[in-house]
Structure formats: structure tokens, C-alpha cells
UniProtKB/Swiss-Prot annotation:
Alphabetical list of HAMAP family matching this protein: Rota_VP6 (MF_04126)
Organism from which the protein derives: Rotavirus B (isolate RVB/Rat/United States/IDIR/1984/G1P[X]) (RV-B)
Lineage: Viruses, Riboviria, Orthornavirae, Duplornaviricota, Resentoviricetes
GO biological process, one term: fusion of virus membrane with host plasma membrane
UniProt name for this protein: Intermediate capsid protein VP6
Function (record text): Intermediate capsid protein that self assembles to form an icosahedral capsid with a T=13 symmetry, which consists of 230 trimers of VP6, with channels at each of its five-fold vertices. This capsid constitutes the middle concentric layer of the viral mature particle. The innermost VP2 capsid and the intermediate VP6 capsid remain intact following cell entry to protect the dsRNA from degradation and to prevent unfavorable antiviral responses in the host cell during all the replication cycle of the virus.
Subcellular location: Virion
Quaternary organization: Homotrimer. Interacts with the inner capsid protein VP2. Interacts with the outer capsid glycoprotein VP7.
Superkingdom, taxonomy of origin: Viruses
One Gene Ontology CC term in the entry: viral envelope
Similarity remark: Belongs to the rotavirus VP6 family.
GO molecular function terms attached to this record: host cell surface receptor binding; structural molecule activity
Keywords: Capsid protein, Intermediate capsid protein, Virion
Length: 391
């Protein structure tokens, strides 16, 4: 969208201006910044545009961007004028975002329609296709101007829950002859408890939103004393647990990194692992088996475990966390820049600053993932994200 591209370019110029310093000789790059600023200021200085302010009222905004005299050395006054000039332009662009964002849209647009905003974009005549904030680049991706950006995602996992319970007919009231895998995960973390009331392997998968690579950290956590077991049929039962993580060996805990049904890489034990591009993780866990029992690793409460009548059942709990995960950016993923966009939404672009707004919660994630008024929501998020890249 041309308004996003204009914001990108003006934000880029602001950063170049702020890299300069007053009372300092300008090198070639500094002279280029001065020339680019003067070219922009000469086109819009003194012009007035009626745009929405932060109270959603049309207000005349006048650009105050003085032209700076060319010199080898920039004075303090000239530097302050240049800095305030680019800030004045950015303030008007913020008003343009509020104005254009208030106009509902149903399809992806390459050009703004709002007359006052369109005039501002034509007067500035400065555009840049990409932003430092990945959310703002999604408009260029949607129109096939650039390839999807590789981003570090903060929420690679689908939110999900596992309640996997297998039991024999003679299951006891304390969890004997029951294999239960209970847990949940969302964002980039999950915690799971595996209770082995019988000799059987726990096996379950955790799905990524899309093909992802990165680092995963897995660590044992203290197991609860008693858990509720949601039985497939009949009343729920209690699982009385004993933490056996002290006797867990590497071969008792395996992690398969899978691309659909193909195993790409397998790691054993807990720890920190780098994993290749995959779209699901499969855990294979065996907290307790007959071999451990025959090796006399059991305690008094596990003496009758093979018969399923022991008062407590062997169990482990573990926490897993994906870290530094990278994937192709899309609307499902939140990158590290999302909180900065949210800050701008809460300060410069509150929902009360728009004369019309989609019926969604006013936060970045809701705008990006809304299925209602989808294109309009995404347009607002991308416009604000482009502005959020400013210093």
C-alpha cells in the first residue's frame, strides 16, 4: 500500500537524520541526508491537510519542515530544525494513518482512496517498500512484491491440550493399570505429566503452526502428588504419583522432529537441542518398565506395580520451551516487534482515534488473526506497524 511505503521511507529518513550530530562536519553520507531532507521539505513545507487527530476529529495539520542551508558543518539550530521538521511530517503521517484506517475495506489495496491522504502521499513523493518491523511488510508479501520474510516467532505452537488415557479392565482407584498423559501447551511453552500405571510407552505429538526451525529446551519438573485422571468411560479417578525422574535414562525419553510423517532428527534425554525445519514434534517417553522394576529400583509404594495394585504410580513431569525459532512470517505469528506495535496502538492510535473501526479487541494479535472484517483489520495493523518503526 502506498501509504505504508511512504511511512517506511519517512521513518527511514528520520533514522538517518538522528544519526547525524550538530556542530559536526558532514561526510558524504551526511550531505546525502541533508539533500534528501531538503528535497522532501521543499515539497510539503507549509502545506495543510485536514486529517483525524487522536480524538477522531478532523483537524488541519500544517507541515513545518524548514529548508536547511547546505554547509559542510551543520549548526545546532539547523539540526534542531531538521529534526523537528521530520517529526512534523511523521505527526501528519500518524494522522493520515488514523484517517485511512477509519475507512473500511474488503480487498487488498495498492493505493489509498481517502482524498486528503492521497494528496499527502502524492506531495511527499517518497516511498520505501520494506520496514524494519515485519508486520508492516505483509502488505508487500500479499501483493507478491517481496517474498515472505524469515522472522523469529514468539508463538510457533498451536494452543492445544492432551488427555490421553489408556487403561486395562482391572484399573485401580489410585491409577494402577492406567497410562495417562496429561498436559497443555501454547505460544512457545508446554508442560506434560506422564503417569505409568502399567508397562507402556507414552507417545504424543505437538504441532507447529508451520514449518519451523530453532532450539528447544526440555527439563524435568516436580510431579504433582495427586492428579485427576479423566477416564474415557465412567467416573474420573485419582492418580497417586511418585516422581521417578531420578531414575530416568536418556533412552527413556526420546524426541522425534518430524516433517509430516517423516522423522528428520531424533534426540534422546532432556536438555537443549537445535532442531531442523519441521512441522511437528513427537515425544516418546517410558517413565517406568519391568526392567527397572527387576533391577530393584522400586520403592515400597511401587512393590506391587506389575500387578497394578501399588498405592502410588511412577510418573514424570517435564517442561518444554521452544527458543529462537524462525519461520516464514505470516499473520499467525507474533515476532519480537509486536509489543512495540501494541505500544503505538495504546498511545498514538487508540481505538477512539478512529471514526470507524472493526469490531475486534484492540490489540495486535486480534487485528492480525481476525476472521471478521479481515482485510480491514490487517490494513490497520500494518499501517500502525510501519509507523512503530520510528525512533
Amino acid at each position: 500500500m502506498d501509504l505504508i511505503e511512504t511511512v517506511n521511507a519517512c521513518v527511514g529518513l528520520q533514522k538517518r537524520v538522528l544519526k547525524l550530530a550538530p556542530n559536526t562536519n558532514l561526510n558524504t553520507a551526511g550531505q546525502s541526508v541533508l539533500n534528501d531532507y531538503n528535497a522532501l521539505a521543499s515539497r510539503v513545507n507549509g502545506r495543510t491537510y485536514a486529517l483525524l487527530d487522536q480524538t477522531a476529529v478532523y483537524t488541519p495539520y500544517t507541515v513545518n519542515a524548514p529548508i536547511i542551508s547546505l554547509a559542510v558543518r551543520i549548526s545546532t539550530d539547523d539540526y534542531d530544525d531538521m529534526r523537528s521538521g521530520i517529526d512534523s511530517i511523521l505527526d501528519i503521517l500518524a494522522a493520515a494513518i488514523r484517517t485511512e484506517g477509519s475507512r473500511p475495506t474488503r480487498v487488498i489495496e495498492r493505493r489509498v482512496i481517502e482524498p486528503n491522504v492521497k494528496q499527502l502521499v502524492e506531495d511527499l513523493k517518497l516511498k520505501s517498500l520494506t520496514s524494519e518491523i515485519s508486520i508492516a511488510n505483509m502488505a508487500a508479501v500479499d501483493t507478491a512484491l517481496i517474498q515472505p520474510e524469515i522472522i523469529e516467532t514468539e508463538n510457533p505452537l498451536f494452543a492445544d491440550i492432551i488427555e490421553q488415557v489408556i487403561h486395562r479392565p482391572n484399573a485401580s482407584m489410585t491409577g494402577g493399570n492406567i497410562r495417562a498423559t496429561l498436559g497443555r501447551w501454547s505460544g512457545n511453552k508446554g508442560i506434560v505429566t506422564c503417569m505409568s500405571g502399567m508397562d507402556s510407552e507414552h507417545r504424543f505429538t505437538v504441532d507447529f503452526k508451520t514449518r519451523t526451525c530453532g532450539i528447544i529446551n526440555v527439563v524435568y519438573a516436580p510431579t504433582a502428588g495427586v492428579i485427576m485422571i479423566p477416564m474415557p468411560t465412567g467416573r474420573n479417578r485419582e492418580g497417586h504419583l511418585i516422581d521417578v525422574s531420578a531414575e530416568m535414562m536418556a533412552e527413556n525419553f526420546a524426541i522425534d522432529f518430524m516433517d509430516d510423517d517423516d522423522i528428520i532428527q531424533t534426540e534422546t534425554g532432556v536438555g537443549v537441542f537445535s532442531f531442523p525445519m519441521c512441522n511437528r514434534i513427537r515425544f516418546r517417553i517410558n517413565p517406568w518398565d519391568m526392567q527397572k522394576h527387576n533391577d530393584n529400583l522400586w520403592t515400597v509404594n511401587l512393590a506391587n506395580w506389575p500387578q497394578g495394585t501399588s498405592p502410588r504410580q511412577p510418573a514424570i513431569s517435564f517442561l518444554f520451551e521452544t527458543r529462537r525459532t524462525f519461520t516464514e512470517g505470516d499473520y499467525q505469528h507474533l515476532s519480537r516487534c509486536a509489543p512495540k506495535v501494541q505500544y503505538m496502538m495504546d498511545t498514538i492510535f487508540p481505538e477512539t482515534a478512529f471514526t470507524n473501526r472493526p469490531v475486534v479487541d484492540w490489540n495486535v494479535q486480534s487485528l492480525l488473526t481476525s476472521s471478521s472484517q479481515k482485510t480491514w483489520c490487517q490494513k490497520i495493523a500494518m499501517l500502525i506497524a510501519a509507523y512503530a518503526a520510528k525512533i
